[in-house]
Regions:
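Alpha-helical transmembrane segments and their immediate juxtamembrane cytosolic regions
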Residues: 1-241
Length: 241
């Protein structure tokens, strides 16, 4: 990924904005539940991280290492939440882990479809449909943050980019199409969830301003540990108050 200075916002910049929104959201949940504005601000976080999962699935050199790192951190949070509340909850990292499975299945489908073999194409379609069906069942049996539509949200971006490249003849410049497809998916998710989730659409101008670069500093470890650490700190504060 090109790291030279460009106009627009880097991935690190939009993720830091999303991280701040997430902290505000969780502070609202635990400490100030009467302040709806904090929850509204928090709606800006999920779309950014979901879109970055889409980016990460394409750019990582170690796909399954990426998955297991994310899933492992999510599982750690699931255990912590169960110890704290006595309830099982599939947090946002579990959602994103399942999103990666969908995206990897779609990438495999694209590889199979590029082969001039009917068996390979059928295999790719079968794996994709099986993955989608399996995740739908998981979301039916277990409470997963943002549900099935939240899991498949990044897929809207990849589908849009694929269609753009195939039919519009885009010369590798798929980012606007990717964000546009993601916007459609986010609208579907917002309408499906209802309530204040519609405010998540306010983040779209920032996503359209994304310049396709990661940023000058490597903040990967920070973002991996940010989620469990900030939840732990907010939980401790709520216990003391």
């Amino acid at each position: 990924m090109n790291q030279k200075p460009t106009t627009g916002l880097s991935q690190n910049q939009i993720k830091l904005i999303a991280a701040a929104a997430m902290v505000i959201d969780h502070v609202g949940v635990e400490l100030f539940p009467q302040l709806t504005i904090l929850r509204i601000i928090g709606r800006l976080a999920f779309p950014v991280f979901s879109y970055c999962i889409c980016e990460g699935s394409r750019l990582t050199h170690h796909p399954w290492k990426y998955f297991f790192r994310l899933f492992g951190m999510g599982l750690l949070c699931v255990i912590g939440y169960y110890v704290y509340t006595g309830m099982f909850y599939g947090n946002i990292l579990i959602t994103f882990s399942l999103s990666l499975c969908v995206l990897y299945a779609f990438q495999h489908l694209q590889t199979c479809w590029s082969q001039d073999k009917i068996t390979a194409r059928f295999a790719g379609v079968g794996i994709m449909l099986g993955c989608m069906a399996g995740i739908w069942l998981i979301c039916r049996w277990i409470t997963i943050d943002y549900g099935f539509f939240g899991v498949i949200l990044p897929l809207f971006a990849e589908l849009s980019a694929c269609i753009w490249q195939r039919y519009a003849g885009a010369d590798g410049k798929q980012e606007p199409a990717r964000v546009l497809g993601f916007s459609v998916g986010l609208l579907v998710l917002s309408l499906q969830m209802g309530g204040i989730q519609i405010y998540s659409l306010l983040i779209l101008p920032l996503l359209f301003a994304y310049n396709g670069t990661r940023g000058e500093r490597n903040l990967k470890q920070f973002f991996y540990w940010f989620y469990p650490v900030h939840l732990l700190l907010i939980g401790l504060v709520s216990m003391w108050i």
